[in-house]
Amino acid sequence: LASVVKHWLKLFNNVNCFFSEDYYIFYKSLKNLYYFWSMMVSRDNGEAPNVDDKFGLEWTNEVATDWKAAAVKRGYWVDPFIYWFQQPKQNILRFPEMLRGYYARVKGIRIVVEQFLDKFAPACQIINFGAGFDTMYWNLSKEGRQIDLYLEIDLPDVVRKKINCILRHSSDLYSFACNEQLQMLIDRNDVMHTLNYHIMAGDLCNTDDLMEKFLSIPIDFSKPTLFLSECVLVYVNVDRTKNLLQMLSNKFAKACFLDYEPSNLNSIFGRKFLENMAQMKVSVSGASFCESVDSMRQIYEESGWSNFKSWKVSAVYLNSLPRQDRERVETLDLLDDPEMLNQMLDHYLFSVATNSDDQNLISIGFE
């Protein structure tokens, strides 16, 4: 049964089946059945679930999107576009610590993005690695923020699903000029190009392939460029991460890399994170990269990023997020144990690295 379900999942991933809501629901049901069957068989055998890395990494995107949608629904922040990609699942216990953690994550990233745009927009670029169902571009556009180029790169299946989700809401999009353009996008279901927004499937472990993707769109390697990465490099082999960082540092004249990752993976919390990923058969190939601040700093500096700074998310939450909004959020859900939130946020880091001595770039970061 599991092999039959997996065959149908692959078929659905390779055709444009998401324009009908019924097909989409059917796909989700198949996927849930596959996970359930894998979990049941593995439990009976006393093993971790037999879910391959590809589905496991897709799962991390869907989980993150679901938590973000739940936080938006609770009023933690405003994001009218999150529901394009995920409706929060009903009747699921939502731990306030997790909702608060996603609030710190989203708001922290937004602070850095706004700093970058305030200094360089519109003649600048943002490239989001492992973007998943991120909605940053749509929110920036809604607010009238101008940018020359915004590129998202992720796994082929994730990109296909995101494009189809966007096309299902095409009547809401002012970015698309005509039906002919939409038809072109349907024909190429793992690539989408608009005037300044691009989304493509790409392999971060293959820098030659990535460079081909860059050259296929109007990227300007001389313009200030902000790279975004949220819980991505922790899943990438450390040598591949070095190759990626070196290529970016060499090709882009003025670049800033904002990374959000788990850290201190040798702690009890870190070992639990690794255990959970192992149970889902997701390879945490970048565990040594995220082992500590020093390990991250060393890899960035060896890869050509001479200016590296990092902050625990707990410090950003307390010292850098707008106080009035933080106090508002803290009234939405009361914490049984505030120390649990602090411990969780202590094990995640924001890091900002630059490959240029440009003071506008170096000044980007948190207080």
Where on the chain are the PLM-derived regions?
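Cationic, low-complexity basic patches in intrinsically disordered or flexible, solvent-exposed regions
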Residues: 7, 11
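Plant-skewed but cross-kingdom recognition/interaction modules and surfaces
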Residues: 95, 167, 240, 248-254, ...
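Rossmann-like AdoMet
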Residues: 16-18, 22-200, 208, 215-217, ...
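A short, conserved alpha-helix within the catalytic core of class I
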Residues: 209-213, 235-247
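Short "lid" loop at the C-terminus of a central beta-strand within the Rossmann-like core
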Residues: 234, 262-267
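Conserved beta-strand signature within the Rossmann-like core of class I S-adenosyl-L-methionine
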Residues: 252-262
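A short SAM/SAH-binding and catalytic strip from SAM-dependent methyltransferases
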Residues: 225-238
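Rossmann-like AdoMet/SAM-dependent catalytic core
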Residues: 268-367
